[in-house]
Amino acid sequence: MIATIVTSVSIIFVVLGALISAFAATGLIRLRDVYSRAHAAGKAATLGAMFLLFGAFLYFIGTEGYVNMQLIIGIIFVFITGPLSSHLIMKAAYNIKTPYTKDTKIDEIKEDMKHTKL
């Protein structure tokens, strides 16, 4: 009984992760500039991958009865590297003066960069 519930919850997490990853892929295709694309990749793809890994983690607990440490390490790795990589991509794009879209109104980074030494 409990194995069926855990398996059902793990399937829900895997499906949610796949849907969020599909939304992230759509954002990468449809968004206009590198800043928006990096934001979509950093936020949505990271959350989607974490849901997929957590669903697999729950599945192994429910069906096999053991904790898979590789999945825990994978979740932690994705949690750290996803937002960090998108931040570095946006910072590099800003430093080489990649243009914004026409819809961008305010450059908040310029004020922050005045007080930062590179």
UniProtKB/Swiss-Prot annotation:
GO terms for cellular component: plasma membrane. Pfam families: PhaG_MnhG_YufB. One of its GO terms (molecular function) is sodium:proton antiporter activity. It is found in: Cell membrane. It is a multi-pass membrane protein. The chain crosses the membrane at residues 9-29, 47-67, 69-89. Keywords: Antiport, Cell membrane, Hydrogen ion transport, Ion transport, Membrane, Sodium, Sodium transport, Transmembrane, Transmembrane helix, Transport. May form a heterooligomeric complex that consists of seven subunits: mnhA1, mnhB1, mnhC1, mnhD1, mnhE1, mnhF1 and mnhG1. PANTHER family: ANTIPORTER SUBUNIT MNHG2-RELATED. Belongs to the CPA3 antiporters (TC 2.A.63) subunit G family. Mnh complex is a Na(+)/H(+) antiporter involved in Na(+) excretion. This is Na(+)/H(+) antiporter subunit G1. The gene is mnhG1.
